[in-house]
């Protein structure tokens, strides 16, 4: 998947959060966004994921304009700085949720494989609130990896 931002900007009220910018991400590459606090990194990633729409400009995936396309149709995984887990669901079900939504087979094996890779297999029967912050972040990462999305954004 190739993702490109073409002359995007983002305004919220009278404030400009992102100024006219273009960016192209290459397939099978790791791209790092560095910037000061409040520089717009999260806003930029939210636009890439389809969670926000730019005020101006276009978001292109493999050359196709997907600006405004709902996040569910983008096949993008995102892990937030303030991670999000489903508090009433056990860790196993948190990781399994995207697999169940897609009707995947072998959910148990896939969840256990991801949990093992991230060293959280011993927590599968616990609720997220019973884990440390770092362990909860790994649960969020495992859920994102379970999506097997061609683009993963880590905030």
Regions found by a protein language model. Name each.
Residues 49:
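Helix-to-loop junction immediately C-terminal to a conserved catalytic motif
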Residues 64-78, 101, 108-109:
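ABC ATPase NBD coupling module
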Residues 89-96:
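Short coil-to-helix segment of the ABC ATPase nucleotide-binding domain corresponding to the Q-loop/switch region
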Residues 106-123:
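Conserved ABC ATPase "signature" region
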Residues 127-131, 135:
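Conserved ABC ATPase signature
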Residues 146-150:
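A short, proline-enriched helix->beta-strand linker immediately N-terminal to the Walker B motif
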Residues 152-155:
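Catalytic Walker B motif of ABC-type/P-loop ATPase nucleotide-binding domains
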């Amino acid at each position: 998947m190739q993702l490109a931002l073409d002359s995007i900007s983002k305004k919220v009220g009278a404030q400009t959060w992102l100024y006219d910018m273009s960016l192209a991400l290459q397939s099978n590459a790791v791209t790092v966004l560095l910037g000061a606090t409040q520089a717009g990194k999260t806003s930029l990633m939210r636009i890439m994921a389809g969670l926000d729409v730019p005020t101006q400009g276009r978001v292109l995936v493999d050359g196709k304009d997907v600006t405004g396309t709902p996040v569910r149709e983008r096949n993008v995984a995102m892990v937030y700085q303030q991670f999000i887990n489903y508090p009433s669901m056990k860790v196993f079900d948190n990781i399994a949720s995207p697999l169940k939504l897609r009707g995947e087979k072998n959910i148990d094996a896939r969840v256990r494989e991801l949990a093992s890779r991230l060293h959280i297999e011993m927590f599968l029967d616990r609720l997220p609130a019973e884990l440390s912050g770092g362990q909860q972040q790994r649960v969020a990462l495992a859920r994102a990896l379970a999506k097997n999305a061609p683009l993963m954004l880590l905030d």
